[in-house]
């Protein structure tokens, strides 16, 4: 198959964790990967590693520019067959210690950008009678705790948006799924920035390469057995 005929997978939130490993997994399966991140250097690294991939510097909270990037990907690569919405923003702070504007910023990245991406990509998916949209989430999508008033509402809304899309477009050939990752993910950022994570054993973390494998598996499900809500956690995670 010529490179121009290979399907395109679009991934937001490319980094050294879930986003990067998901890009590797889809590239391994023969996809051309359109990668979105805020850091050019990170994108260059993955472009060099994954032949046929292409990086786009984009802050998904800039909704007008996000739409511009979607058009650019369609023109330069082709309409994405798969969207993995992995970009995330969260502030973990008690209500009275935080700032109300945090909620709006988090909402734009976690939820509104998914709406914009879906609104742009779904018409081509409908035309082709196939497509996959997967959003990655966490337990904040299912419950709020004292330190998540600026984060949990945005993830809950993200999940409900995904559910609405699944109910609308599933019968039309588009598979929409929501993956809840119920654990800390083993990345350098998690290890170095969160004090109580530094000395944890690897088995206490969800491994990003394993998450990526599950994301890919879900994207390939047969139409008679599609998943929507999928929960991933290490075997020793309490839940």
Task: Go through each PLM region and give its residues.
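Conserved glycine-rich Rossmann-like NAD(P)H-binding loop of the short-chain dehydrogenase/reductase
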Residues: 31-45
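Conserved glycine-rich cofactor-binding loop
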Residues: 15-17
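Rossmann-fold scaffold of SDR-type NAD(P)-dependent oxidoreductases
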Residues: 12, 80-88, 110, 135, ...
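C-terminal helical subdomain
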Residues: 171-180, 198-239
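The beta1-alpha1 cofactor-binding region of Rossmann-like NAD(H)/NADP(H)-dependent oxidoreductases
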Residues: 57-68, 100
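Catalytic Tyr-X3-Lys loop
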Residues: 89, 96-115, 134, 158
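A short, exposed helix-loop element centered on a Lys and neighboring polar residues
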Residues: 118-119, 163
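Catalytic loop of short-chain dehydrogenase/reductase
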Residues: 132-157, 163, 167-170
């Amino acid at each position: 198959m010529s490179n121009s005929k290979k399907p395109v997978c679009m991934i937001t939130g490319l980094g050294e964790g879930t986003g990067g490993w998901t890009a590797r997994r889809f590239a391994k399966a023969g996809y051309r990967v359109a990668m979105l991140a805020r850091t050019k250097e990170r994108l260059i690294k993955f472009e060099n590693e994954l032949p046929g991939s292409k990086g786009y510097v984009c802050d998904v909270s800039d909704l007008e520019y996000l739409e511009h990037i979607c058009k650019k990907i369609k023109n330069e690569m082709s309409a994405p067959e798969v969207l993995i919405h992995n970009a995330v923003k969260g502030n973990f702070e008690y209500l009275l210690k935080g700032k109300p504007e945090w909620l709006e910023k988090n909402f734009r990245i976690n939820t509104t950008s998914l709406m914009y991406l879906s609104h742009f990509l779904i018409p081509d998916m409908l035309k082709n009678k196939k497509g996959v949209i997967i959003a990655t989430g966490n337990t904040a999508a299912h419950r709020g705790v004292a330190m998540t008033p600026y984060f949990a509402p945005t993830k809950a809304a993200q999940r409900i948006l995904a559910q609405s899309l699944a109910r609308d477009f599933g019968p039309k050939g588009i598979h929409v799924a929501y993956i809840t990752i119920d654990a800390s993910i083993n990345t350098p950022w998690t290890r170095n920035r969160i004090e109580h994570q530094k000395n944890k054993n690897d088995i206490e973390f969800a491994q990003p390469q394993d998450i990526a494998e599950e994301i890919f598996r879900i994207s390939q499900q047969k139409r008679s057995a599609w998943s929507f809500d999928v929960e991933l956690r290490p075997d020793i995670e309490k839940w």
